[in-house]
UniProtKB/Swiss-Prot annotation:
The lineage of its organism: Eukaryota, Metazoa, Chordata, Craniata, Vertebrata. InterPro entries: CaRF. The gene is Carf. It comes from Mus musculus (Mouse). Acts as a transcriptional activator that mediates the calcium- and neuron-selective induction of BDNF exon III transcription. Binds to the consensus calcium-response element CaRE1 5'-CTATTTCGAG-3' sequence. Highly expressed in brain and testis. This is Calcium-responsive transcription factor. Its main location: nucleus. One of its GO terms (cellular component) is granular component.
Amino acid sequence: MEQRHSLAGNCDDGEKSEREAQGFEHRTCMDSGDPSFGQNDPPTILPITAPKTYDSLTSQDMPETLTDTQALHEEQFHLLDQNGQPIQYDLQSLGNSTAQMTGMEQVAIPQEPFADEHSPQDISEEKPTGVRADVLEDSTSNYGLRSPASLVLPKKAGARLVEEPLLAPLQPLSCNTPMWACRLRSCEKIGDSYRGYCVSETELESVLTFHKQQTQTVWGTRQSPSPAKPATRLMWKSQYVPYDGIPFVNAGSRAVVMECQYGPRRKGFQLKKISEQESRSCHLYKATCPARIYIKKVQKFPEYRVPTDPQIDRKIIRLEQEKAFTMLKKNLMDAGGVLRWYVQLPTQQAHQYHESETPGVPLSPSPFPMSPLEEEEAIVRDENCALPSRLHPQVAHKIQELVSQGVGQVYAVRKQLRKFVERELFKPDEIPERHNLSYFPTVNDIKNHIHEVQKSLRTGDVVYNSEIIPATLQWTTDSGNILRETVTVTFAEGNLLGEPIPSKMGTSQTQTAVSPEPLSSFPPKIFTHFQALKLQPRLSSPDGSQALVSVDSHASSSPPGLVDTVGNAEVDNHSVLLGQSQNPGTDTCLTQDNSTSSSTGHLPESVPNPVAEDQLLEGEDVEDAGNPEGSVNRTLLGDVQTVPIQIIDSRPVLVEESLSKNQVKQETNEPTLSTEAKTFLDCKKISAT
């Protein structure tokens, strides 16, 4: 049942000048249950002191005080204006967390002037006056308020507000919301953090201190705003400031960023020493805590507020925004405005990797005891997430998928994640803001996840799944089985796709042509890193066949003597050919100066699929004299990266270097073998005998 209250406010004309000289006004409070109420008897006076200004329509925000020692039971109060007319009001409860903690209430009073209507006005001072009524003791009075209340004095109709009343949270907070989060205005939860704003530096310092005490964490400033010229760009929202229909400008060039003491280590003399020690001891990448505090100072202009009702047409809101911007640009210097400090504070669950291995560094502080609901929420999240992360499970799975495909660059992964979230996870109207770290992780978060996935792949905890490879990279056999072999890839010119290529040994081999479409999906890094023909060690497929890998992107970058098993072959990147061998009974290694060495005497003729080329030697000569058995020294060209290409044919796959155009024409006109081929065949006959 809604109660109607009244307060009688009377002023003694004889003492009016003296009261105004002292800057206070005296009002009266009457009990409607008193039998003398409404009669000529003087009412009982309760002192309420409030400062008054002489150039404002209303008084400023200063606490007023009511005193009483006895609680009233069901009394009603009436509020009277200076003319003795009653003013009705409704007792309403504040819908924010601060009001729930303090038990404060708010009184809504109709907009009617108390003071003289001819008094001067100032837009910057036309804000509601909140009159706090706290219970005090008065031995001579029998009246008082049962619970504290906040009386809001009226303002003149049509005037804009500079300081809007304490707004309700953007979304209802759960019962397990931390106390430090309840102190933020318009608080909302974003992932593992809470965001709100403060209206003064004192309030900001109080919230930060309370947060550090409850979470028992230590923070260091990573970034602070620079003393640049004042910002003039008008904005409605940003990475740190949510949209609330009020335009603003940034009060600093950058936001304040604070990192946990277990966060990333920064540049410095000590860091160089530590990096050298870790490089000597071959330490792997160490994950660091991703928890951060963000503080952004802005200047808001509430008098240019636009409606935020979602039922209003967007075109109308857009027109209102343009009109507000136009007016604000003209009066930006005289617009005034209010300052706000938007703060985003992480919870205890946002802290990770606090295990310390460095001597002399204090161990991770014990976490602040959580409520049962917080513990239950943390347990559920740990069960649902494969990796310890504050990221959304689908985002974490996407990182694992990208790393399994070979994408290890941090910024490449971040680009793919943003596309995944904005195009696949959410509709265009439901995309979360970029500051939601659950869907838009930081670079440090991505580094930690890449490290965890790579470690799991090495240890075998995460099995490589070929089903997540793009279809353009999947090669299968005739039966449809996916092959995981690495194959020889050689760029050649002078032959059409599918055209039979005669070999130097006089046998015609049918070439299996591969269209260049699969190459478009290769990372460009592969072709820039492989400057020469590089061959992997032989790998055995399930059916016993052997395969090699060879990638060459530029013919000019190849060694000057790059040849095939017999003669010279020009290598280019016009086509990709995969050939089948007709039992070449040699295993030959080539040096840079075209020297060849045969080891056919050690390979029996019964071996079905000997490899024509095993390794390419660069800058080294074959030392036959030092090897009594005649074996050949083989050297890899640095680090070789495997390419996840699948074989279409299940038969053995070998390298078939193509010939240049001139050589093809010469061999088509001259069926006889060259002297080099004859020499090769003679060596083969001798080894067979």
